Amino acid sequence: MSSAQAEDEQDYETPSCYELQKHFTHGGVAYTHVNEVWPGVYIGNEETARDRYKLQTLGITHILNAAEGEWNSVDTGAEYYKDMQIHYYGVTAEDTPTFNISQYFYSAAEYIQQTLSDPHNKLLLHCVMGRSRSATLFLAFLMLQQRMSLLQAVEQLAHRRHICPNWGFLKQLRELDTHLQEERRRTHT
C-alpha cells in the first residue's frame, strides 16, 4: 500500500446514511430484474430467482436467497432447484429497519467468497426486489472479503444495479465499516 493510500484510509470517515442514499439516487442505473454486479455475481429479484430458463441462460450454479422465510419472502428453497444442479443457501431476513441483518454479514460473505473461488461458478444473490437485503449482503461481502470501505462498496455496486437498502441496514453497514476501519488502523500503526 502506498503512503497516499494509507493517508486516505486514515482520513476516511464513514459516511452518514443520508450521504450514502445520495449515491443510490444520483446517476445510478435503471432498475432491471437482474444485473451482473461483479465477475460471476448477479443480483436479482424474485422473478429472476423463479425463472429456471433465465438461471440456465445465465449459467447460475449457486443461489443465495436473502429473503427466505414466511413474510415478504421468496419461498423457493433448495427443493425448487434440486434438478438444476444449483447449490442453494438461504437466510431468513426481513426487509425492516429493525431487523438485524448483520448476523448474516460474515456467513454470507464467506459463502460468496467460497462460490467465487471456482471461476466456473456463477452466483445469483436475490431477495424480493433485489434492492435491499441482497444488496446489503453484497455490500458486506465487498467490505469483508474485498477490503473496500462502505463508500467504495456503495460506489461499486450503485454503478451496476439500482439498490436501496433500508435505513436500518445502512446503519448496520456503517457499524461494520467503522469496525473494519478501526481494525485496519490498528494493524497499520
UniProtKB/Swiss-Prot annotation:
SUPFAM superfamilies: (Phosphotyrosine protein) phosphatases II
Keyword Cytoplasm: yes
Keyword Secreted: no
Enzyme class: hydrolase
Catalytic activity: O-phospho-L-tyrosyl-[protein] + H2O = L-tyrosyl-[protein] + phosphate; O-phospho-L-seryl-[protein] + H2O = L-seryl-[protein] + phosphate; O-phospho-L-threonyl-[protein] + H2O = L-threonyl-[protein] + phosphate
InterPro entries named in the record: Atypical_DUSP_subfamA, Dual-sp_phosphatase_cat-dom, Prot-tyrosine_phosphatase-like, Tyr_Pase_AS, Tyr_Pase_dom, TYR_PHOSPHATASE_DUAL_dom
Molecular-function annotations in GO: MAP kinase phosphatase activity; protein serine/threonine phosphatase activity; protein tyrosine phosphatase activity; protein tyrosine/serine/threonine phosphatase activity
Amino-acid positions noted as binding substrate in the UniProt annotation, renumbered to this chain: 126-133
EC identifiers of the protein: 3.1.3.16, 3.1.3.48
Entries under Pfam families matching the protein: DSPc
Domain Tyrosine-protein phosphatase: residue ranges: 33-182
Gene Ontology cellular component annotations, sorted alphabetically: cytoplasm; nucleus
Protein's recorded name: Dual specificity phosphatase 29
Organism: Danio rerio
